[in-house]
Amino acid sequence: MIQKNWQELIKPNKVEFSSSSRTRATLVAEPLERGFGLTLGNALRRVLLSSLRGAAVTAVQIDGVLHEFSSIPGVREDVTDIVLNIKEIAIKMDGDDAKRMVVRKQGPGVVTAGDIQTVGDIEILNPEHVICTLDEGAEIRMEFTVNNGKGYVPAERNRAEDAPIGLIPVDSLYSPVKKVSYKVENTREGQVLDYDKLNMTIETDGSITGEDAVAFAARILQDQLGVFVNFDEPQKETEEEAVTELAFNPALLKKVDELELSVRSANCLKNDNIVYIGDLIQKTEAEMLRTPNFGRKSLNEIKEVLASMGLHLGMEVPAWPPENIEDLAKRYEDQY
């Protein structure tokens, strides 16, 4: 069946987010197939940094200023430095239409992003950010154009042909995600020791949480990769077909290598061709002790594990083993 190509790959049973602040979050996802930590980590990182939409200033008009190479009496920074500071204003804005916001202040003092008068659904996320410094008697008025977009747009592309004199275009840094780093470690699942564990740290401007950013990036990848799927999804079995009455506890379909036994005990079971718990519980204590290298310590370990599942050695299991045991194990894996 073609669906086994993707259905039989292990998927993370642990996806955890933790946030140390409004702008920083950490993701841990495990276990992943070997190599998938790097594959998914790199893909998510690229999309997070390049493809999520956010808001940014696209242009500014400063009273009395005709171009960005000017200086303003009583203002310590020149216009070029002011424009650079404006680029760093973090903004959250809903909607796709361009909006305007204004700041007007007299000196002496510092003009910060928190001094900006916003309208509608615009929110300044770093109000402490310094835009410029005014001396005694100085005054400044600036009007900003704000828009939504994605990625990085240079000032030249924000320069409208019919723009009035004095409207200075600004480089727009739309991405709400500022930094992404990840590392891949080994992790264990059952007796398999070389699965991948993905650790990712996401830093945003505060307009979006790290968890939502990852969710949006994953959805973008899902949507983009979907165009390469050139077949219809195989039909799922009907409920009537899917439900098979078992004559035994579904837990017996679990493989013994998932019991996290000691290496010695696990190797003894493997050498005795005991694959499933259903194989194991039909053995008596005497039969187990006749297994090469299997001692009383291993026996007690296995009895303790089985007891925690409500099972014991020497049980009788009707209709065991079933013919389609692998398919049944897949079907009932969420029940043990």
Curated annotation (Swiss-Prot):
Disulfide bonds: none annotated. It is an enzyme of class 2 (transferase). Residues 248-336 are annotated as: Alpha C-terminal domain (alpha-CTD). GO terms for biological process: DNA-templated transcription. Its EC number is 2.7.7.6. Keywords: DNA-directed RNA polymerase, Nucleotidyltransferase, Transcription, Transferase. GO terms for cellular component: cytoplasm; DNA-directed RNA polymerase complex. Residues 1-232 are annotated as: Alpha N-terminal domain (alpha-NTD). It catalyses: RNA(n) + a ribonucleoside 5'-triphosphate = RNA(n+1) + diphosphate. It comes from the Bacteria. Gene3D superfamilies: 5' to 3' exonuclease, C-terminal subdomain, DNA-directed RNA polymerase, insert domain, RNA polymerase, RBP11-like subunit. One of its GO terms (molecular function) is DNA-directed RNA polymerase activity. Homodimer. The RNAP catalytic core consists of 2 alpha, 1 beta, 1 beta' and 1 omega subunit. When a sigma factor is associated with the core the holoenzyme is formed, which can initiate transcription. NCBIfam families: PRK05182.1-2 (NF003513), PRK05182.2-5 (NF003519), rpoA (TIGR02027). Belongs to the RNA polymerase alpha chain family. DNA-dependent RNA polymerase catalyzes the transcription of DNA into RNA using the four ribonucleoside triphosphates as substrates. The N-terminal domain is essential for RNAP assembly and basal transcription, whereas the C-terminal domain is involved in interaction with transcriptional regulators and with upstream promoter elements. This is DNA-directed RNA polymerase subunit alpha. It comes from Rhizobium leguminosarum bv. trifolii (strain WSM2304). The lineage of its organism: Bacteria, Pseudomonadati, Pseudomonadota, Alphaproteobacteria, Hyphomicrobiales.
